[in-house]
UniProtKB/Swiss-Prot annotation:
This is Polymerase cofactor VP35. It is found in: Virion; Host cytoplasm. It comes from Lake Victoria marburgvirus (strain Popp-67). Residues 204-329 form the VP35 IID domain. The keyword Transferase does not apply. Belongs to the filoviridae polymerase cofactor VP35 family. Plays an essential role in viral RNA synthesis and also a role in suppressing innate immune signaling. InterPro entries: Filo_VP35, VP35_IID, VP35_IID_b-sht, VP35_IID_hlx. One of its GO terms (cellular component) is host cell cytoplasm. Gene3D superfamilies: Filoviridae VP35, C-terminal inhibitory domain, beta-sheet subdomain, Filoviridae VP35, C-terminal inhibitory domain, helical subdomain. Homooligomer. Homomultimerization via the coiled coil domain is a prerequisite for binding to L. Found in a trimeric complex in which VP35 bridges L and the nucleoprotein. Interacts with NP. Disrupts innate immune signaling in infected host cell. The lineage of its organism: Viruses, Riboviria, Orthornavirae, Negarnaviricota, Haploviricotina. It holds the Pfam family Filo_VP35.
Length: 329
């Protein structure tokens, strides 16, 4: 331990000059003070070669890490720029999507109205087609059969106005033997036999004649005597013979309601309707090919080995010279 009295004497000696400074601190008192205050591990400590090599390798690692960080920073700069561009593009796309959604909400009522109009148009076309084939009569068409028979028995002649209805009494009078019936009654019975009895099936799909069906199709076709007019006649005749004229007309109107034109509807039906699959086209005899309608002359082709309607062959023209040409659509 330090002696406090001794240290006090030394301090007093130094302050009064009785004790020289060199005697206490040596020749260079600041050298010991410098050495005492000098931090450890700078010059006083010598590093071994092993530690020096480790320090050098650590510096290299730190330098490599700095280079890697700088490289990564250089790479991240364009990536950040691209991400910002993508973000701005996404914002624009989101804005446009919201705008489209708003427009769709505005268009929805118009689309519903379009579907309603399409359904109304389809229903009206079917009603018009059926209306053309309903029996239209005037006069006493609502008179009951009893009133008709009473008038006939009283006056001996039927009512002056036409009365077309299904009356068993008139039919029996017209067909019974030994009964003299007036010509008017006979005509009424003939008309009644020709009237199509309306039912749920016959009203929805009336069995039209080939001529009436072709005339209906002609109203949708532009021009005259085109290959599609010939196709309409051929398809109408085949549909009538197969008893599917009503179904064919309904399918035709269905395709028209989808937005197709009459030519496309006839072409599709000729290749998909079951009554036309595998059917051989009819042979039409002509004097020469100059008598073929002019719009059809450019569509004449050589007759293939097995022509069918579902493959686009409408008919085959045969001239008096024995030559044949097929009409192709």
């Amino acid at each position: 331990m330090w002696d406090s009295s001794y240290m006090q004497q030394v301090s007093e000696g130094l302050m009064t000059g009785k004790v020289p400074i060199d005697q206490v601190f040596g020749a260079n008192p600041s050298e010991k003070l410098h050495k005492r205050r000098k931090p450890k591990g700078t010059v006083g400590l010598q590093c071994s070669p092993c530690l020096m090599s480790k320090a050098t390798s650590t510096d290299d690692i730190v330098w490599d890490q700095l280079i890697v960080k700088k490289t990564l920073a250089d790479l991240l700069i364009p990536i950040n720029r691209q991400i910002s561009d993508i973000q701005s593009t996404l914002n624009e796309v989101t804005t446009r999507v919201h705008e489209i959604e708003r427009q769709l909400h505005e268009i929805t009522p118009v689309l519903k109205m379009g579907r309603t109009l399409e359904a109304i148009s389809k229903g009206m076309s079917e009603m018009l087609a059926k209306y053309d084939h309903l029996v239209i009569s005037t006069g006493r068409t609502t008179a009951p059969a009893a009133a008709f028979d009473a008038y006939l028995n009283e006056h001996g002649v039927p009512p002056p106005q036409p009365a077309i209805f299904k009356d068993l009494g008139v039919a029996q009078q017209a067909c019974s033997k030994g009964t003299m019936v007036k010509n008017e009654t006979t005509d009424a019975a003939d008309k009644m036999s020709k009237v199509l009895e309306l039912s749920e099936e016959t009203f929805s799909k009336p069995n039209l004649s080939a001529k009436d069906l072709a005339l209906l199709l002609f109203t949708h076709l532009p021009g005259n005597n085109t290959p599609f007019h010939i196709l309409a006649q051929v398809l109408s005749k085949i549909a009538y013979k197969s008893g599917k004229s009503g179904a064919f007309l309904d399918a035709f109107h269905q395709i028209l309601s989808e937005g197709e034109n009459a030519q496309a509807a006839l072409t599709r039906l000729s290749r998909t309707f079951d009554a036309f699959l595998g059917v051989v086209p009819p042979v039409i005899r002509v004097k020469n090919f100059q008598t073929v309608p002019r719009p059809c002359q450019k569509s004449l082709r050589a007759v293939p080995p097995n022509p069918t309607i579902d493959k686009g062959w409408v008919c085959v023209y045969s001239s008096e010279q024995g030559e044949t040409r097929a009409l192709k659509i």
